Swiss-Prot record:
This is Regulatory protein RecX. Belongs to the RecX family. The gene is recX. The keyword ATP-binding does not apply. GO terms for cellular component: cytoplasm. Keywords: Cytoplasm. It is found in: Cytoplasm.
Length: 153
């Protein structure tokens, strides 16, 4: 008979550090993960305070990382802002992150459109509407979409 070795449960702080060593997390996201793992709220707050104090947890760094990741996926500013809002990153942190990670949203919209539609301009209104919807879903503004789908783009 084999007995499975079960390691002692890690402390909340150690779990938080382990999660943060893999990738950046926002405060809300880390708190949620620790709660799901069953740690007491007092232990979670203590671990969060430790991680903030030692620079392991930083919402600005997390937001900038998320911006870079979403831009790499071809997402526009609106979609990225919505995702960060869902992760409960504060508006001021989001504004600072966008200021520190400048993007040319018009050119990004154009390159996403080129990749998706192979540079083919819509000949019919129905096809044009389909292209617009795709870019709207990706989080681009109408001005950016118009630029991306225009002939001078």
């Amino acid at each position: 008979m084999h007995h499975r070795f079960t390691p002692p449960m890690m402390s909340c702080k150690d779990t938080a550090i382990q999660l943060l060593s893999r990738r950046d997390h926002g405060q809300y996201e880390l708190r949620q993960k620790l709660t799901v793992k069953g740690y007491a709220s007092q232990d979670i707050e203590s671990a969060m305070h430790f991680c903030l104090e030692h620079g392991y947890l930083d919402d600005l760094r997390y937001a900038k990382s998320q911006i870079r990741q979403h831009v790499g996926k071809g997402h526009g500013e609106r979609r990225i802002r919505q995702e960060l809002s869902l992760k409960q990153v504060s508006d001021s942190v989001v504004e600072n992150a966008f200021a520190e990670e400048p993007q040319d949203w018009f050119e990004l919209a154009k390159s996403v459109a080129m990749k998706k539609f192979n540079g083919v301009k819509a000949k019919e209104q129905k096809e044009y509407a389909k292209q617009v919807r795709f870019l709207q879903y990706r989080g681009f503004s109408f001005e950016q979409i118009r630029y991306a789908l225009s002939d001078e783009a």
